[in-house]
């Protein structure tokens, strides 16, 4: 068995169920959790809290380098703790999202956040959720999973989520949004969305979450025992 800190990466397109899978894996394995998709929003929120200009690389790089953030699986949710405060609700605000898109466009900030994400690799282990965790951030991870599902299934899941919240949405619109995002993610010049060569590809289209977790755990346990 490897003496290095075990890292499990879960990549895949939007709506495939990565967040739920990672939360459940982190709980079952007793590992730390990294939600890389939220990290730019967290940095943007830290900048807002500290009065830092979200377009200033010089000001943002030290903030990114020392970003004090934790992702904690609790119940059915992942709580985001920034500087000791639960900011899960604030992360979803439009203001935070707009600031995050500015932050994400700055190359030196991206580099600083890449190093900060790698610092999550601490004992007893890490489950990292994202789009390029296995191909860019943790290329040496012992267990890599690429979780996929058809665009139609992902649109159906999103439709149900939004309808459960009382929102009136059309399946065709959601499907179109998902297909456009897939196209952007898979064809972007930097870190395009693709499975790592050594990843287990899991298609969750016709699987329950319990089946996905069981398959993933079997694979992880076999890789960590090598």
UniProtKB/Swiss-Prot annotation:
<dbReference type="GO" id="GO:0006220">
    <property type="term" value="P:pyrimidine nucleotide metabolic process"/>
</dbReference>
<keyword id="KW-0963">Cytoplasm</keyword>
<dbReference type="InterPro" id="IPR027417">
    <property type="entry name" value="P-loop_NTPase"/>
</dbReference>
<dbReference type="Pfam" id="PF02224">
    <property type="entry name" value="Cytidylate_kin"/>
</dbReference>
<dbReference type="GO" id="GO:0036431">
    <property type="term" value="F:dCMP kinase activity"/>
</dbReference>
<dbReference type="GO" id="GO:0015949">
    <property type="term" value="P:nucleobase-containing small molecule interconversion"/>
</dbReference>
<comment type="similarity">
    <text>Belongs to the cytidylate kinase family. Type 1 subfamily.</text>
</comment>
<dbReference type="InterPro" id="IPR011994">
    <property type="entry name" value="Cytidylate_kinase_dom"/>
</dbReference>
<keyword id="KW-0547">Nucleotide-binding</keyword>
<feature type="binding site">
    <location>
        <begin position="12"/>
        <end position="20"/>
    </location>
    <ligand>
        <name>ATP</name>
    </ligand>
</feature>
<dbReference type="GO" id="GO:0036430">
    <property type="term" value="F:CMP kinase activity"/>
</dbReference>
<keyword id="KW-0067">ATP-binding</keyword>
<keyword id="KW-0418">Kinase</keyword>
<keyword id="KW-0808">Transferase</keyword>
<dbReference type="InterPro" id="IPR003136">
    <property type="entry name" value="Cytidylate_kin"/>
</dbReference>
<dbReference type="GO" id="GO:0005524">
    <property type="term" value="F:ATP binding"/>
</dbReference>
<protein>
    <recommendedName>
        <fullName>Cytidylate kinase</fullName>
        <ecNumber>2.7.4.25</ecNumber>
    </recommendedName>
</protein>
<dbReference type="GO" id="GO:0005829">
    <property type="term" value="C:cytosol"/>
</dbReference>
